[in-house]
Design a protein with these regions (language model features):
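C-terminal ends of transmembrane helices
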Residues: 7-24, 61-74, 125-134, 155-165, ...
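Cytoplasmic-side transmembrane-helix entry/capping segments in multi-pass membrane proteins
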Residues: 2-5, 20-33, 51-55, 74-84, ...
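Selected transmembrane alpha-helices and immediately adjacent juxtamembrane segments
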Residues: 77, 82-139, 222-274, 343, ...
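Transmembrane helix-loop junctions at the membrane interface of multipass transporters and ion channels
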Residues: 38-45, 95-106, 177-200, 317-323
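Structural signature of hydrophobic alpha-helical transmembrane segments
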Residues: 1-7, 45-58, 107-118, 143-148, ...
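Membrane-interfacial helix-loop connectors
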Residues: 145-150, 156-165, 169, 175-182, ...
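C-terminal transmembrane helix pair
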Residues: 185-189, 200, 294-355
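Alpha-helical transmembrane segments and their membrane-interface exit regions
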Residues: 5-14, 55-66, 118-122, 208-216, ...
């Protein structure tokens, strides 16, 4: 309860100091939250976490000026969303049990929390990087970076650019291909960090996908290049974190249940899940593989199929947002990428063996 009051107090301090032009700003607000968390962690006996946070707060205070330069590209709402997001993570962490049973499935909330933090760090790096991009090839680069955060949302943004200027066809087509490239790369990074053994089976498919999509994207750019403004919205916020956590939990339970059914139920479920939210599917597959609930080979095959399903979903988004004439131009590249990824995972399973 005390932490909730402190969090509210911190947010109020930040907003009021921003309006008044006071020196109390982002780093001070973050430091207040983290310092209070140090006491909570020590009280719970989490001394390692307390030491880590102590070092972190020292770095934040030491690099205060650089931090101000970093967040200078963010508006007040975006910084407020980030603060609320950090506060939410801090409130939830001490309350989470290490594991519990739900519908006969062993759920590990702390692991899900850690995955959300990992994804958030990736999103933050991409989000900040996008603010410092040069103007050259901005549509294509924003397509790639946006694909790392929210695939379907950035497709909608690209199509808005296309609707405003039909001459941007080549740029938007290249951007769509790069969005899917980024999606493959993001999901690959997440599943291999969570379950490193899957690297043996998803590494070759990723290389084949990159070798297919990047040249096609470059080909569109060589035809004609134009510039346009596009913006990536903040990926932070209480609702975004809650939605991600609930999605991972739900998909994890469904995948674990489908595995118990035997046959191809796991693969079918991964495909259906990939049509909706491939990130949650890939994270859940990695978690199941890490806990030896499924093998690395099963996780890899389901991972590739989920990504293939997500490509289909992206085509649907492209269609409904007004990109009917673009589908025929980019379908060849995407079809080849799906085929080579599936061939790649089977070759990997043959090469590295079954278990």
């Amino acid at each position: 309860l005390a932490f909730i009051f402190l969090a509210a107090f911190t947010v109020i301090i930040y907003y009021t100091s921003t309006k008044r032009g006071s020196n109390i700003g982002f780093t001070t607000s973050i430091s207040l939250v983290i310092t209070f968390m140090l006491g909570i962690f020590v009280g719970f006996g989490w001394r390692t976490e307390a030491i880590f946070l102590g070092v972190l707060i020292s770095i934040i205070l030491f690099s205060k000026e650089r931090m101000h330069q970093l967040v200078s590209r963010l508006n007040q709402k975006e910084i407020g969303d980030l603060l609320e997001f950090l506060v939410l993570l801090g409130i939830i962490y001490p309350l989470l049990p290490s594991s519990f049973e739900l519908f006969g499935v062993n759920v590990q909330p702390l692991m899900i929390w850690g995955i959300i933090v990992m994804i958030s760090v990736l999103n933050f790096c991409v989000f900040m990087g996008a603010r410092y991009l040069p103007i050259q090839h901005k549509v294509e680069l924003f397509g790639f970076l946006g694909g790392l955060i929210n695939t379907q949302a950035i497709i909608g943004s690209l199509m808005n650019v296309y609707k405003q200027n039909k001459k941007m066809f080549q740029n938007v087509a290249s951007g769509f291909i790069l969005i899917n490239t980024a999606m493959y790369l993001r999901n690959f990074i997440l599943i291999t960090i969570i379950a490193p053994l899957t690297l043996l089976y998803v590494g070759i498919p990723l290389v084949l996908v990159l070798a297919t999509l990047i040249p096609f994207s470059r080909l569109f750019l060589m035809m004609k290049h134009r510039e346009a403004q596009i913006r990536i919205d903040s990926p932070f916020g209480v609702w975004a974190a809650a939605k991600l956590g609930l999605a991972i939990l739900l998909v994890f339970i469904i995948l674990d249940f489908s595995r118990s059914l035997g046959g191809n139920a796991l693969l079918i479920t991964a495909v259906l899940g990939g049509l909706v939210y491939s990130l949650a599917v890939c994270v859940s597959l990695g978690t199941l593989a890490l806990n030896n609930v499924i093998t690395a080979q099963q996780a890899a095959l389901a991972f590739i199929l989920a990504n293939a399903a997500s490509v289909i979903s992206n085509f649907f988004v492209l269609y409904v947002t007004g990109g009917k004439d673009m589908i025929s131009k980019v379908s060849k590249a995407m079809f080849i990428s799906v085929v080579v990824s599936i061939l790649g995972v089977f070759l990997s399973i043959i090469a590295f063996g079954l278990s």
